Swiss-Prot record:
Family that this chain belongs to: Belongs to the FGGY kinase family.
Reactions this protein catalyses: glycerol + ATP = sn-glycerol 3-phosphate + ADP + H(+)
Pathway: Polyol metabolism; glycerol degradation via glycerol kinase pathway; sn-glycerol 3-phosphate from glycerol: step 1/1
GO molecular function annotations of the record: ATP binding; glycerol kinase activity
PROSITE patterns: FGGY_KINASES_1, FGGY_KINASES_2
Gene3D superfamilies, per database record: 3.30.420.40
Chain residues that bind glycerol: R83, E84, Y136, D246, Q247
Biological source species: Francisella tularensis subsp. holarctica (strain LVS)
Positions annotated to bind ATP: T13, T14, S15, T268, G311, Q315, G412
Annotated GO CC locations: cytosol
Identification of the protein by name: Glycerol kinase
UniProt xrefs under InterPro entries: ATPase_NBD, Carb_kinase_FGGY, Carb_kinase_FGGY_CS, FGGY_C, FGGY_N, Glycerol_kin
Length: 502
């Protein structure tokens, strides 16, 4: 039977998805299922790892069945996943010892504060992992599980526990425990991986008291990791051939193969990445240095700005405040007025990411008067997304010395034309929206396809990607500068709030 398709596994923060692509990049079928968000305490976020696997395996079967594709027609599987979220499980039984601790979870802030008391070690972490010390990353989450789950430390020291980011957890289950591996992009998000030596960093592991025996093997992003167990997908042994964290996969899906090319993904969070080539560039502006992907043992590096709350702010004005009935309504209300009338909303619900890295910042709405209406709050929420992206991209310009030559965008929020136009205005730059919005999944599929010869080279991949719409700046630079100064003032009001008022 001919191998005409590649299956993308897209395991996100709020849902598990499976998408079948053909050789022209067309989507044959999408299946999606949401799963439970667990909030045990304020600032804590967890997922049930077994529910993640259950929903993911379910949507894979659903996509195949309703897409009328037989497992034997799948040339390869590409995996892309929410990053930093980590699972610790029993090596023998495959059972998690605790819920997955999600990237948004702030429970390890105190561990990070302890690390920050040693400036030399903080410097070591930045120079060798490319990351800042923050509760966002996987390393301190693993330490918390080992320190707080009864019996976990003893089992880990005895070599009976394994850990992994979500890609590793999925690979383990797809292969029924035969493969315990991750790729360079996901490894680079743990705060445990040395992006210079391309090895797990023993000094950091020792500091956090994490046994190296728990850690997965690190492989190329485009490489056959193993095959699905014969009991997983209708008896077929399908190569798992592409793996990348969601933002890295999106950069690859946008075909940002050359140094200086950048993309921004608008999802639960907002993530801008710029390809900086085959050598890491370290930021003076609060950006992260990360491995974008690796092929044939050679990494491509990127600068990244991470914004924690983007799509979630629209969910909040819908579900928390009841200002809109649907996310789509936000565009309608935002365009009913000419401006926010000086209102700014800073959605620092779980702190601020790049370039501020303030774990204790909290959300604020400033500039309210008796004239403030629902429309002003809604528009301010949308504008906050664009302002945060500008914060990040301005830092990239400073660190690389490169002007932004257009920005490639993807994610759910790119369907909001008001937001995309405002983003173009505030950046004073062209915004390109591709016809295929499933760019993250496409990137995973591209990586898998290259590994198994489904596509011959990157030039062929570029021919698949086409542009749907280009947004050009319509606002003058003086007005933009004025509005951006207001945003910066609003951010200052949100900083250190939880620290001051806890």
């Amino acid at each position: 039977m001919s191998k005409d398709f590649i299956l993308a596994i897209d395991q996100g923060t709020t849902s598990s998805r499976a998408i079948i692509f053909d050789k022209k990049g067309n989507i044959r079928k999408i299946a999606q299922k949401e799963f439970t968000q667990i909030y045990p305490k304020s600032g804590w976020v967890e997922h049930d790892a077994m529910e993640i696997w259950g929903t993911q395996s379910g949507v894979m079967r659903e996509a195949l069945e309703f897409g009328r594709v037989k497992p034997d027609q799948i040339a390869a599987i590409g995996i892309t996943n929410q990053r930093e979220t980590v699972v610790v499980w029993d090596k023998e039984t495959g059972d998690p010892v605790y819920n997955a601790i999600v990237w948004q979870c702030r429970r390890t802030s105190s561990i990070c504060d302890e690390i920050k008391r040693d400036p030399q070690f903080v410097k070591y972490i930045k120079e060798n992992t490319g990351l800042v010390v923050d509760a966002y990353f996987s390393g301190t989450k693993v330490k918390w599980i080992l320190d707080n789950v009864e019996g976990a430390r003893e089992k880990a020291n005895a070599g009976k526990l394994l850990m992994g980011t979500i890609d590793t957890w999925l690979i383990w289950n797809l292969t029924r425990g035969k493969v315990h591996a991750t790729d360079y992009s996901n490894a680079s998000r743990t705060m445990l991986f040395n992006i210079n030596s391309l090895e797990w960093d023993k000094k950091i592991l020792d500091y956090l008291n994490i046994p190296e025996s728990m850690l997965p093997e690190v492989k190329n992003s485009s490489e056959v990791f193993g095959v699905t167990d014969s009991h997983t997908l209708g008896g077929a042994e399908i190569p798992i051939a592409g793996v990348a964290g969601d933002q890295h996969a999106a950069l690859f899906g946008h075909c940002c193969f050359e140094k200086g090319m950048a993309k921004n993904t608008y999802g639960t969070g907002c993530f801008a990445l710029m390809n900086v080539g085959d050598k890491p560039v370290y930021s003076d502006e609060g950006l992260l240095t990360t491995i974008a992907w690796a092929e044939n043992g050679k990494p491509t590096y990127a600068l990244e700005g991470s914004i924690f709350i983007v799509g979630a702010v629209i969910q909040w004005i819908r579900d928390g405040l009841g200002l809109v009935r649907s996310a789509e309504d936000s565009e309608y209300y935002a365009t009913k007025i000419d401006s926010t009338n000086g209102v700014y909303l800073v959605p620092a619900f779980v702190g601020l990411g790049t370039p501020y890295w303030d774990m204790y910042a909290r959300g604020t709405i400033v500039g309210i008067t008796r004239d403030t209406k629902r429309e002003h709050i809604i528009r301010a929420a949308l504008e906050a997304i664009a302002y945060q992206a500008k914060d990040v991209l301005e830092c990239m310009k400073e660190d690389t010395g490169l002007d932004l030559a257009g920005l490639r965008v993807d994610g759910g929020a790119v369907q909001n034309n008001f937001l995309m136009q405002f983003q173009s205005d505030i950046l004073q730059s062209e915004i390109s929206k591709p016809k295929i919005n499933e760019i993250t999944s496409l990137g995973a599929v591209f990586l898998a396809g290259l590994a198994v010869g489904f596509w011959k080279d990157k030039q062929e991949l570029k021919s698949i990607l086409t542009t749907e719409k280009v947004f050009e700046p319509q606002k003058d630079s003086q007005a933009v500068a004025h509005d951006y100064r207001g945003w910066k003032k609003a951010v200052e009001r949100s900083k250190a709030w939880a620290e001051c008022y806890s």
